[in-house]
């Protein structure tokens, strides 16, 4: 589980953080100052990368949260086996079996290159690369 730590005030929409043990992408972030002597609070709405669950968090802006280290890679489709696809990583040449995302079912074909991410021990195909 590769993570690093950052303060909430450094986070922006579109960045990633760990909520509920899952790597999540921030969809909205807002801050509010409660009053004269209170610390500013941040409300974060995020969606899980791998499970698509909505999560929210309310904490002071100077609180620390875990940030997942996300590795974006490129692989070539070797074989399509029903609902799964077998990829070969183009850097390490290792083969990986991953499920095909619903939105990419028609786009993935043998020999095509796809981008996939690896974070916290999970992998997911994100998109197909153009030109193939």
Curated annotation (Swiss-Prot):
InterPro entries: IF5A-like, IF5A-like_N, NA-bd_OB-fold, Rib_uL2_dom2, Trans_elong_IF5A_hypusine_site, Transl_elong_IF5A_arc, Transl_elong_IF5A_C, Translation_prot_SH3-like_sf. GO terms for cellular component: cytoplasm. The modification Hypusine is found at residue 36. Its main location: cytoplasm. The keyword Cytoplasm applies. It comes from the Archaea. Belongs to the eIF-5A family. This is Translation initiation factor 5A. It comes from Methanosphaera stadtmanae (strain ATCC 43021 / DSM 3091 / JCM 11832 / MCB-3).
């Amino acid at each position: 589980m590769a993570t690093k730590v950052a303060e909430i005030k450094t986070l922006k929409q579109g960045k990633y953080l760990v909520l509920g043990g899952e790597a999540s992408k921030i969809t909205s972030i807002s801050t509010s100052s409660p009053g004269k002597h209170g610390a500013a609070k941040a409300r974060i709405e995020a969606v899980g990368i791998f499970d698509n669950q909505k999560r929210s968090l309310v904490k002071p802006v100077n609180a620390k949260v875990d940030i997942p280290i996300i590795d974006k890679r490129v692989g070539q489709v070797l074989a399509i086996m029903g609902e799964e696809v077998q990829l070969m990583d183009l850097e390490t040449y290792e083969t990986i079996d991953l499920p095909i995302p619903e939105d990419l079912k028609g786009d993935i074909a043998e020999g095509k290159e796809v981008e996939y991410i690896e974070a916290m021990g999970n992998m997911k195909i994100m998109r197909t690369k153009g030109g193939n």
